[in-house]
């Protein structure tokens, strides 16, 4: 079990989202009175790793929490992650987000005073933490990378969906990339081929007699192979939708989606291919 705590504004939400992506069962702001029972239940009945976020909203119980966690560590494998940042950085983040600090008394207290009050309140947890991260100079992506390094994990696999479609039926609203293959030779104008689709051999054989379809599929796949790593490495994307469109979504886009997918599966074996409009014509 991982206890995620630290200063408000230091990145607990980013940490929890990262942990969820890594397969953790995450609980935010669990009342401390329920912590013992929660730990016992998960230790006995669940193999999934769990992360519990605790912050200053539990102020009345924080003073006794460090002793409780020390006791629990003797019987359960618990690690404590403490997120910190400089006071001026936290104040700026609250100003930019326009969110109230959980300990701020609006009648008499300034944000700096609330931050220092929280820092003092959480001092005992800071002292017993197994992992300390200062996020003063971090972007969200930096915190995510640092957390994965500390936990000795890698980024989750990018889930890629290749979708063929017909422009006359509309571009998929969830597409991250859109490729237009209406410039390719069109088997629709061959009456004997019209009833087939791009997964069937008559269409495959007809399109492969031209250089352009195979060349476009190969070059598009190589382009994607090069740039997709940036979506996991820098942008931390969990999924990506690639749409390939022709006029009706039955022939050319289906063939290209299957061809590109066959190449990309060498690096992304879980890639999913779907043909949205293959039955609409």
UniProtKB/Swiss-Prot annotation:
It holds the Pfam family PapZ_C. GTP binds at residues 55-58. The keyword Nucleotide-binding applies. GO terms for molecular function: ATP binding; GTP binding. Transmembrane segments: none annotated. ATP binds at residues 6-13. InterPro entries: P-loop_NTPase, RapZ-like, RapZ-like_N, RapZ_C. Belongs to the RapZ-like family. Displays ATPase and GTPase activities. This is Nucleotide-binding protein DNO_0399.
């Amino acid at each position: 079990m991982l206890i995620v705590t630290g200063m408000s504004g230091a990145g607990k939400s980013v940490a929890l989202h990262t942990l969820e992506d890594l397969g953790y069962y995450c609980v935010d702001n669990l009342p401390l009175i329920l912590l013992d029972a929660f730990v016992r239940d998960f230790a006995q009945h669940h193999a999934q790793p769990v992360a519990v976020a605790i912050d200053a909203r539990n102020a009345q119980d924080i003073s006794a929490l460090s002793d409780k966690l020390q006791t629990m560590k003797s019987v359960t494998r618990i690690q404590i992650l403490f997120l910190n940042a400089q006071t001026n950085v936290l104040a700026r983040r609250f100003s930019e987000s326009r969110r109230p600090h959980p300990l701020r008394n609006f009648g008499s207290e300034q944000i700096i005073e609330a931050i220092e009050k929280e820092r003092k309140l959480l001092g005992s947890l800071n002292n017993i933490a197994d992992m300390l991260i200062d996020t003063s100079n971090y972007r969200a992506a930096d915190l995510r990378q640092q957390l994965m390094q500390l936990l000795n994990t890698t980024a989750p696999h990018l889930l890629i969906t290749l979708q063929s479609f017909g422009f006359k039926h509309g571009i998929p609203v969830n597409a991250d990339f859109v490729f237009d293959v209406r410039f390719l030779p069109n088997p629709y104008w061959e009456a004997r081929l019209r009833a087939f689709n791009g997964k069937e051999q008559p269409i495959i054989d007809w399109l492969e007699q031209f250089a352009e379809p195979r060349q476009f599929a190969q070059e598009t796949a190589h382009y994607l192979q090069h740039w997709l790593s940036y979506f996991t490495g820098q942008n931390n994307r969990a999924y990506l939708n690639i749409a390939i469109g022709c006029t009706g979504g039955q022939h050319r886009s289906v063939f290209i989606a299957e061809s590109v997918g066959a190449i990309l599966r060498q690096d992304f074996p879980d890639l999913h291919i779907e043909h949205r409009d293959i039955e609409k014509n």
